[in-house]
């Protein structure tokens, strides 16, 4: 009887071992693009992460946190090999990959193209829920809101107008997160047409905005011959640049867009 009891105890212990291992296994999170990388790194730093190849590029806000992390291409083969529990994406991954992931029961979080800070809050909550990190999500929203309070103009302060311009010669009007960033810092957007649009060198010369907010000029290898870098544009903007926002602050509809607003405020 004593031997039978020992055998039964060993059998129960062995049977329970895989279940315990499964419960303690780190969450496996795969990101399909650079924006997904930011959310995965911020909300699930303790997870087993498979990040996109662009996770540590100069225009990645969380590039330092990405150091030493696994990188994979956003392919079906990579997903099959990694076996993620959750996939985070903004635009990455083709229809075939997404269909196969969902068929396998993988949770796929698609970040919305947020055009204001309420939309960013929605992205954070959706990603935090899928990544089982609601507390981290709340902390991230609180951090963003604190930055927005820092950026907010004094009550009654007049709004100054400014033109947002990238090195590639693009600007942004209403219905974009850039417009929300300008507004959060108390700046009135000179562009009234919605969405993103190119701005010609000739128009800038004739228009001669009183203030410029420049962005994506820190990417020395990107758009190095773009209209925004034209000598005539440089002369038009001389002495009129409110701030130069780093590309990393505006590459993704995420919480660090509030840092861009705070930079504008700090630049005066």
Per-region residue spans from a language model:
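Alpha-helical, coiled-coil/dimerization segments enriched in small aliphatic residues
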Residues: 53-60, 65-68, 171-197
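Boundary at the C-terminal end of the N-terminal hydrophobic targeting segment
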Residues: 8, 19-22
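A short, structured surface patch at a secondary-structure boundary
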Residues: 28-82, 86-92, 193
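Basic- and aromatic-lined ligand-binding clefts that recognize polyanionic substrates
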Residues: 25-43, 135-185
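Bacterial N-terminal signal peptides
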Residues: 4-15
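Structured C-terminal subdomain patch of bacterial secreted/periplasmic proteins
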Residues: 27-28, 32, 118-129, 138, ...
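Flexible loop/hinge segments that line or gate small-molecule binding clefts
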Residues: 98-126
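Short beta-strand->loop
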Residues: 89-91, 110-114, 163-175, 246
């Amino acid at each position: 009887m004593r031997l039978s009891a020992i055998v039964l105890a060993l059998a129960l212990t062995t049977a329970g071992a895989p279940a315990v291992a499964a419960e303690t296994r780190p969450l496996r999170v795969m990101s399909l693009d650079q924006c997904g990388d930011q959310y995965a790194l911020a909300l699930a730093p303790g997870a087993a992460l498979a990040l996109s190849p662009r996770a540590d590029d100069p225009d990645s806000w969380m590039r330092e946190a990405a150091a030493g992390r696994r990188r994979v291409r956003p392919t079906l083969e990579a997903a099959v090999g990694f076996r993620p529990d959750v996939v985070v994406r903004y635009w990455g991954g083709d229809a075939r990959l997404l269909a196969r992931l969902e068929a396998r029961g993988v949770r796929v979080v698609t970040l919305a193209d947020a055009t204001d800070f309420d939309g960013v809050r929605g992205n954070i909550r959706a990603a935090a829920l899928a990544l089982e990190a609601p507390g981290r999500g709340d902390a991230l929203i609180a951090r963003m809101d604190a930055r927005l309070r820092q950026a907010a103009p004094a009550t009654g302060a007049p709004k100054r107008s400014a033109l947002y311009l990238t090195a590639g010669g693009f600007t942004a009007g209403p219905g974009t997160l850039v417009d929300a960033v300008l507004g959060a810092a108390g700046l009135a957007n000179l562009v009234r047409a919605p969405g993103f649009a190119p701005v010609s060198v000739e128009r800038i010369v004739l228009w001669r905005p009183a203030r410029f907010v420049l962005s994506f000029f820190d990417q020395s290898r990107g758009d190095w011959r773009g209209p925004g870098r034209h000598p005539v544009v440089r002369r038009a903007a001389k002495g009129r640049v409110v701030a130069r926002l780093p590309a990393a602050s505006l590459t993704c509809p995420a919480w660090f867009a509030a840092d861009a607003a705070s930079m504008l405020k700090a630049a005066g």
